[in-house]
Amino acid sequence: MEFKVLAVGDVVGNPGLERVRRHLRQLKRKTGADFVVVNGENAAVVGITPNQAEDILDAGADVITMGNHTWGKREIVDYMEDCPQIIRPANYAPQVPGRGWQVFETKAGDVAVIDLIGRCNMDYGPDNPFLLIEKILKQITAKIILVEIHAEATSEKLAMGYLLDGRVSAVWGTHTHVPTADARILPKGTGYVTDLGMTGPRDSILGIRPDLSIAKFRGDLTERYRWAEGPTKMEAVLFTIDSATGKCIKTERVDEWD
């Protein structure tokens, strides 16, 4: 049977949350998605609160993934320990709270979701994701395996895609907030896209007010980032997977802009 996975780009600020609240279920119905993964690490611009996580789950997400802003809101720590539907990068140090991967029961059987963070131009010095993923895969028996890599470098994301080609169902990138036009199936049957994009203000610089971002580039370090207002967008990719083989049989961008 076909199993459709909707992967939604980073939710940015209140505009992104409002877009999710109003439109995620509609997009889920429109695409026929069976399983929805949303990156939520920028829901509070830097981090996510428990209430924001609940809003995203209530809107139709099955899993929330995180990234380099996982710990932006300290109140998420206890919530993350108690809620298996929110996962942080698996290659953070073993003692940090939360979980880096999780297996979920679905109509197509078990589905594993793994969250990784890249190391090129990223903070915190995480463990090597290319080595850790091998250890994780040895623990997973699910036929359908989904991997998100939250990374800056396109080459690092592509390398992860090719490393896992034929071994997992889909690999997608997040973090840059800019959607890439390379959604495809790799030679051995893994669905891939370098970056999903973002969910939030349409007329913005990565979700932030353009004037504030420009001020930073001009050298004004006193301005604080604030999300832009106005029309919004939701950028996402739909992966259609053969549940019998775990292979991806179709990839499709399903971006929606106001």
Regions picked out by a protein language model, each given a short descriptive name:
Residues 1-258:
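Acidic, metal/ion-coordinating pockets
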